[in-house]
Amino acid sequence: MTRAKPEDDEYWNSSKFKAFTFDDEDDEFSRLKESKRAVNSILVDDDDDEDDVEKVSWSGEPVGSISWSVRETASSIRSGSEQNFPKIDTAPSLSKQGSGYSLSSLFKAKSKPTAFQSFSESFSETSARTYAPELRKPKSDGKDFVSDLSPEETIRRMQKGRAFSMEKFRSLQDKLLLLDEAVSVYDGNVITAVLIYLKKSLSKEILFRELMPREVALRHYIHYLKEMGEQKLLVELLKALGRTEDMALMQYKEHLNIKDEGRRRDFLKSCLSLPFSQDDSTHVQDHYTLLERQIIIEASDKKADTDIFKKFPRKASILNMPIITTLYYSCFYHYGEPEGTFSSPSNIRKTFRISEKQYITTALGARAKLKSWFDVDSLFNTKNWLGYTKKRSPIAFHRVVDILQKNSAPVQVLQEYVNLIDDPELKLSVALKYKCHDIIINTYRDLKDRQQLIVYREKLERDSPEYRKIQELLNNGQIRWKN
């Protein structure tokens, strides 16, 4: 062969293409070694223009691209003799729990790497994250998964406020074990939480049956139903327990949820046949009778056009008011009506068995409010067998004076009732409190206490009738003073 021309040598030496030769040093192995040295020189050389260089793999694909990562990962799996990883399905499993990795994190490019990653680094970063088998957590950490806890462990976690689950307790036996364990720790919140779960997961018949021999749990369940206002279920429970009187009372309380007075009256009427105790039965009967009467009075007084309704207009309806409020209303607007009318105070007193003391106190307040002092006197006037009139009261007269004073009774009326107080010291105390001058002066005179008269005289205005009266007593030589 003829030697190449000098210009040909210059061409082959300067071009990136090399001429074909049969020399041993130009074989494929030599070219691979040269390429590796070239790559290593690039890794060592930290050129400032690195951002302008596109890094490619042996196949010409950009390093870090999705296709490159997939191909590199797949090739690493095929070389199983070196890595010895088990062969698994490469399809992603979306149903696995507890995995913090995602498909996007597999191909997430790093920002501005300072150097190429080696082949082993690329392999460990991709395949280990994606294809390594997911290891089970140690058994000691299994307690964090609450599905395998025993009743005792579940209750302890509930007490400590840690995560728990009662859904695994599906059989009746397991649920009762859970309830018994809750009762044994004497924690009301835990017992109530378990009862709520049993209420949701058991029929009421089975739940009622199992609660009967468990008195503590039963009391908590009854209290829970009361607090939640589940009256209907509570009535069924009490009936199943044979507690008929309690059941009747709970059913009676349903009237509080009825707003319409007519429907409430009818409901109360239906309650009369319930198995109440004797005292409770009387109470329910009175409640029904009172509401029935209030409806009649309310309908009549709405249309009333008498002077008292014009002078003192009603401020509220009488419906659903207590019996004493109804009596006060009757004494205020219907005082003096014949006993045969529903609105008569005497009729109400007789129908509902109101005591004399309660009746006098209520009527006194109503008539004193109207400044009807004649009616006030008539409440206390009684005749003896000789026909003489005398004031008598089932309540103490100092209480009568208090009620009269609150309703701005004149001094003459107050003094009349202060004089009826039997205890001299109490009489003097009440008289001083309400400035009943005549009673104070007469009391000091009866006690022959000259010094107290002098002291009290200084509290009065000069030339007032009371001042002159004290002066006359002090000048009276017939009185034997103690001091």
Swiss-Prot record:
One of its GO terms (biological process) is vacuolar transport. It is found in: Cytoplasm; Cytoplasmic vesicle; Early endosome; Recycling endosome. One of its GO terms (cellular component) is early endosome. Its main location: cytoplasm. Pfam families: Vps16_C. High levels detected in liver and small intestine of larvae at 5 days post-fertilization. Keywords: Cytoplasm, Cytoplasmic vesicle, Differentiation, Endosome, Protein transport, Spermatogenesis, Transcription, Transcription regulation, Transport. It comes from the Eukaryota. PANTHER family: DEFECTIVE SPERMATOGENESIS PROTEIN 39 (PTHR13364), SPERMATOGENESIS-DEFECTIVE PROTEIN 39 HOMOLOG (PTHR13364:SF6). Proposed to be involved in endosomal maturation implicating in part vps33b. In epithelial cells, the vps33b:vipas39 complex may play a role in the apical rab11a-dependent recycling pathway and in the maintenance of the apical-basolateral polarity. May play a role in lysosomal trafficking, probably via association with the core HOPS complex in a discrete population of endosomes; the functions seems to be independent of vps33b. May play a role in vesicular trafficking during spermatogenesis. May be involved in direct or indirect transcriptional regulation of E-cadherin. Interacts with vps33b. Belongs to the SPE39 family. This is Spermatogenesis-defective protein 39 homolog. It comes from Danio rerio (Zebrafish). The gene is vipas39.
